[in-house]
From Swiss-Prot:
Cofactor: Mg(2+)
InterPro entries attached to this UniProt entry: 4CMD/NDH-1_regulator, AhpD-like, CMD-like
Listed Gene3D superfamilies: AhpD-like (1.20.1290.10)
Pathway, per record: Mycotoxin biosynthesis
E.C. code: 4.1.1.-
Superkingdom of origin: Eukaryota
Keywords carried by this UniProt record: Decarboxylase, Lyase
SUPFAM superfamilies: AhpD-like (SSF69118)
Similarity comment: family membership: Belongs to the carboxymuconolactone decarboxylase family.
Protein name: Nitrosuccinic acid decarboxylase npaB
Pfam family membership, one: CMD
GO molecular function: carboxy-lyase activity; peroxiredoxin activity
Role of this protein: Nitrosuccinic acid decarboxylase; part of the gene cluster that mediates the biosynthesis of the deadly neurotoxic nitroalkane 3-nitropropanoic acid (3-NPA) that acts as an antimetabolite of succinate and irreversibly inhibits succinate dehydrogenase and disrupts mitochondrial oxidative phosphorylation. NpaB facilitates decarboxylation of nitrosuccinic acid produced by the nitrosuccinic acid synthase npaA to yield the final product of the cluster, the lethal mycotoxin 3-NPA.
Length: 146
């Protein structure tokens, strides 16, 4: 941290706001586990992600949380970061993104990221949604036909 109290106050504020947003999107359980399992080596990374991504970028005007989730899904598919895709699929559902919209984001990403990435992404997103249903975290709307 800085020796300037104003900078430290700013970091604290961004961290608090970031934790609120991160919990709203990813859930308390995940955030608590990530935060509590951070080591002295990884804690600065958790702080950076929470302050910058969640306390700043996810709070900006211009895109709502649903739009940010769809963008994030496409970007993660391009990176082939499958654990993150599962996490952000949960977040997308929490942000009101429908299964149909998630599926379409995966199909759209398949065209630009390649078939292997798209096939894996389809499996990861479907598995995640089904796990959420099994745990009672999500109820599939009847009219979706999925």
């Amino acid at each position: 941290m800085s020796t300037d109290p104003k900078i430290n106050d700013l970091h604290r504020e961004l961290l608090e706001e970031g934790l609120k947003m991160r919990r709203a999107v990813l859930g308390h359980e995940y955030v608590d586990r990530a935060w509590n399992n951070a080591t002295p080596f990884t804690r600065p990374g958790q702080q950076l992600i929470t302050e910058y991504a969640w306390g700043n970028v996810w709070q900006r005007p211009g895109l709502d949380r649903k739009q940010r989730s769809l963008l994030t899904i496409g970007i993660i598919i391009a990176q082939k970061a499958w654990l993150e895709l599962a996490l952000h699929t949960r977040g997308a559902i929490n942000n009101g993104v429908s299964e149909l919209e998630i599926r379409e984001a995966v199909l759209h990403s398949t065209v630009y990221c390649g078939t292997p990435a798209g096939v894996e992404a389809m499996m990861v997103t479907e598995k995640t949604i089904n796990e959420m249903i099994e745990r009672g975290e999500y109820k599939r709307p009847e009219e979706t036909g999925l």
